[in-house]
């Protein structure tokens, strides 16, 4: 990712409309490949991944506080979706470790969103964790439309499978 692209992204995140709400409204330029929708939450491919298969999980409601914006029940419902989507992702994309974190800021990208990022096997330790998610050190992974469509289709198919039974692992 070039410095210009990062600067453009940061400007849009800080001064533009909510990207999640715009996506939900169908605003051109805010389209994402949705892989899960239960009516209250969505999961979709990250448009700017550093790792293959990186997803975002969001509540449909515009909530800005990742803890205080939820009741305990609504927070746990969102986390069930995070778990369900991450489990499906681990079945589709080979991973050594699944990163799950909430980013965003009161200064930009305010809509609560959880990042689910599969670290592939064999990445040296020094290139893991936050380094693996950093555009400035890792760059942005470029997928063709065909590759992104194929990945989204595989994830949708996995998410349509019956729920995991007790004790079954990813």
Regions picked out by a protein language model, each given a short descriptive name:
Residues 1-170:
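HIT superfamily nucleotide-processing domains
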């Amino acid at each position: 990712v070039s410095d210009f692209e990062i600067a453009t992204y940061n400007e849009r995140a800080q001064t533009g409309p909510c990207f999640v709400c715009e996506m939900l409204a169908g605003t051109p330029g805010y389209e994402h490949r949705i892989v899960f929708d239960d009516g209250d939450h969505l999961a979709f491919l990250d448009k700017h991944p550093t790792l293959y298969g990186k997803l975002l999980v969001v509540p449909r409601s515009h909530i800005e506080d990742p803890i205080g914006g939820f009741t305990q029940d609504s927070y746990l419902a969102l986390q069930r979706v995070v778990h369900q989507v991450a489990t499906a992702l681990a079945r589709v994309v080979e991973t050594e470790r699944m990163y799950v974190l909430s980013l965003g800021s009161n200064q930009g990208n305010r809509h609560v969103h959880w990042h689910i990022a599969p670290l592939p096997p064999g990445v040296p330790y020094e290139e893991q964790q936050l380094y693996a998610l950093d555009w400035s050190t890792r760059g942005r992974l470029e997928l063709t439309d065909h590759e992104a469509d194929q990945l989204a289709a595989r994830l949708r198919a996995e998410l349509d499978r019956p729920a995991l039974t007790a004790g079954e692992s990813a």
